[in-house]
Structures are given as C-alpha cells and as structure tokens.
C-alpha cells in the first residue's frame, strides 16, 4: 500500500505524524512525506522518504512570526496544488493530512483518495477556538474547515481522550481518539536534587526570551538542577546564567525526561504529553494566547498534574510555582496516572490500524 503523509513546519505537529508514518512503513507499506523544505532533515532522520513542496511559500517556524502571519501559510493554495500534482503523478492508496492544512485536504478530497485528517492536539481547541479563529480566516481563502474535516473518511485525534473536553460532546462519525502519540520510557530518577527540564516552543513566538530569562532567574534560587533547551528560537547566550542551570540550544529530551522531576514548558501538546508519559508533572507558561497552549495547560491543571501561569508571571511567582509542584506529591501522583495511561494506550498502533483499514 502507498501512503502519503502531508504535513507542515509547525513545530509539535510533526513528531506524532512522523511516528505514525514510521510505524506504517515498519508494517511493510510504502510511505512518502511531503512538507516544507525545513522539515527535510527531521523526516529523513525518521527513516522516511521526503519531498519538499515545490511551489509553496517559504516557511520556517523557528523564525519570529506574528500570530496573523500563520494564516497565509495554513491556507497556501500552492500547498494544495503541490499535493494535487503529487497525487496525479504517484497516486497514493491513502493520504494522511495535517488537520490545519485545508488546501491539502481539499486536494485529496478532489482526487477521491481515501484519507484521514490527523488532529495532533486536543479537539476541544481545534473544534472551538481554532475553528472560530483560523476557520473564519480560512473562509476568506475559500475553505470551510468543518466541511472539510467532516467529509474525511477518518479524523484521528492524537491525544488522551479523558483530558479532552470535546470527547464529552457528540462528534461526527469519522472522529476517533487514539491517545497521545509520544515516545516514553519508564522514569528512573536518581537520588539528589531534582532535575528540572525547561523546554519552551521551538517556534518563534514573541516574548519567549523574556519568559525564559525569568524562569532561569527563578530556578537559580532553588535547590535543584535544571537543563534549559531553547530549540533554536532563542540563542542560549542571551539568557542569564546560574551555577545550577545549564542552557543548551538542543538536547535529547528522550534521554533527559526519565531522570526529570518537572517540565517547565509553553504548553505545546507534543512536549507536554511527552513529559506526562514519563510521569512528570508540568508547569505551563503559554507562549501564545491564540494557540492550543492555554487549553492544554488548563486540562492538565484540572487533572491535578500541573500548574499553568500567564507569560507575564514574575520571577517570584514562577519560583513559588516550581517549589509547589516539586513539594506536593499530588502533582506527581496525577502525572504518573496519566503516564501509565499513555504508555498503555498503544496509540501509534491504533492509528496505524485505522489508516491501513481505509482500503
């Protein structure tokens, strides 16, 4: 079977789709991924064949962008044209399309290719704030977001169902929650001061450097060790220094997370649920009020597995929040419950079964 995965350089949307694509390939199927040129290395590192959009506008999510600048990228008609041309030349048996790429979704529907929408965050956000905001903007480009989603053969929602408020409402017949698709290892926390991982967005959200600086200043006053990763969006040497804080551009989160006791992050779905999969409670400081980050943070806080704060929070407020989450075992207990659920869900396998079942 020939399966096409259609994605974009949006940060946390990429890893779960690539995990599913790799699993489909491991099952013996032919897989191709098409996306922005900036994703080439990431896709090839996953062992997958990659094709860059030939005519889509240039896009690099690590650069600083205003919220409005994402709208033309989401609705880039050239993405639709590139996907349509690829489908005509190398007809896939199945296509899996990022939920935010409406031009690509329209293209595979026009080509009558069996397809799945890949929803990489909580549907509570996608069918609420995102549909009303980005969906309204998409109408100006001629795309009806609900119509395109509902017309798909399948809509895979890659998050923990019980933490997604939308799961308690009636849904279109094509919607399937599979669980969070994130890598996880059983935690192994060594004796000594707790290790804290700080990972804000790899996207260029404005104001992130100031938030990170306050986080470093807060960590410097506490009896712990911390690793701060900036992900290319912020230069490490622009942040304060402290004896107990190591600042890196990049680090292997998979190697760090089993040893960490807390994640301080922006609330991006992928990194947040990856931390929870390692039984880590989270302190979420959203980088953007228009993204899913605030709702992700609220859902985790409601489950007792973390705390969420505004990005203007003071150094002292951040310090108190870090101390509270590390000091009260209830946060770790709730995170561990979610972690066991994620590790036991086999979400990636469920997604593969649904995708390969379309033909």
Regions found by a protein language model. Give the residues of each.
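A fold-wide structural signal in alpha/beta-hydrolase
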Residues: 225-227, 281
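Short, solvent-exposed coil/turn linker segments
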Residues: 185, 235, 308-311
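Nucleotide-activated sugar donor-binding and catalytic core shared by glycosyltransferases
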Residues: 1-32, 38, 42-49, 85-89, ...
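Nucleotide-sugar-dependent glycosyltransferase catalytic domains
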Residues: 29-225, 232, 239-240
């Amino acid at each position: 079977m020939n399966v096409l995965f259609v994605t974009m350089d949006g940060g946390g949307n990429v890893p779960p789709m690539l995990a599913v694509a790799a699993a489909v390939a491991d099952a013996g199927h032919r897989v191709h991924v098409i996306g922005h040129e900036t994703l080439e290395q990431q896709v090839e590192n996953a062992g997958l064949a990659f094709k860059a959009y030939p005519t889509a506008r240039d896009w690099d999510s690590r650069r600083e962008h205003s919220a409005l600048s994402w709208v033309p990228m989401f609705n880039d008609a050239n993405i639709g044209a590139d996907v349509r041309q690829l489908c005509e030349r190398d007809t896939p048996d199945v296509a899996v399309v990022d939920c935010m790429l409406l031009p690509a979704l329209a293209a595979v529907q026009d080509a009558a290719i069996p397809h799945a929408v890949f929803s990489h965050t909580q549907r509570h956000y996608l069918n609420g704030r995102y549909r009303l905001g980005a969906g309204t903007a998409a109408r100006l480009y001629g795309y009806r977001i609900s119509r395109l989603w509902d017309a798909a053969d399948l809509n895979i929602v890659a998050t923990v169902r019980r933490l997604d408020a939308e799961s308690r409402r009636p849904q279109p017949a094509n919607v399937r929650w599979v669980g969070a698709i994130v890598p996880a290892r059983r935690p192994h926390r060594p004796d000594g001061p707790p290790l804290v991982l700080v990972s804000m967005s790899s996207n260029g959200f404005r104001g992130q450097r100031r938030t990170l600086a306050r986080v470093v200043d807060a960590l410097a006053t506490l009896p712990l060790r911390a690793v701060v990763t900036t992900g290319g969006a912020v230069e490490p040497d622009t942040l304060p220094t402290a004896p107990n804080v190591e600042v890196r551009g990049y680090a292997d989160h998979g190697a760090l997370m089993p040893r960490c006791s807390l994640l301080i992050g922006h609330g991006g779905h992928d990194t947040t649920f990856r931390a929870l999969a390692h039984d880590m409670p989270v302190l979420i400081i959203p980088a953007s009020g228009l993204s899913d980050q605030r709702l992700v943070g609220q859902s985790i806080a409601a489950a007792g597995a973390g705390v969420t704060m505004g990005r203007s929070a003071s150094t002292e407020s951040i310090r108190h929040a870090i101390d509270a989450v590390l000091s009260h075992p209830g946060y770790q207990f709730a995170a561990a419950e979610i972690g066991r659920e994620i590790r036991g869900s086999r979400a990636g396998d469920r997604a593969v079964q649904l995708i390969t079942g379309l033909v």
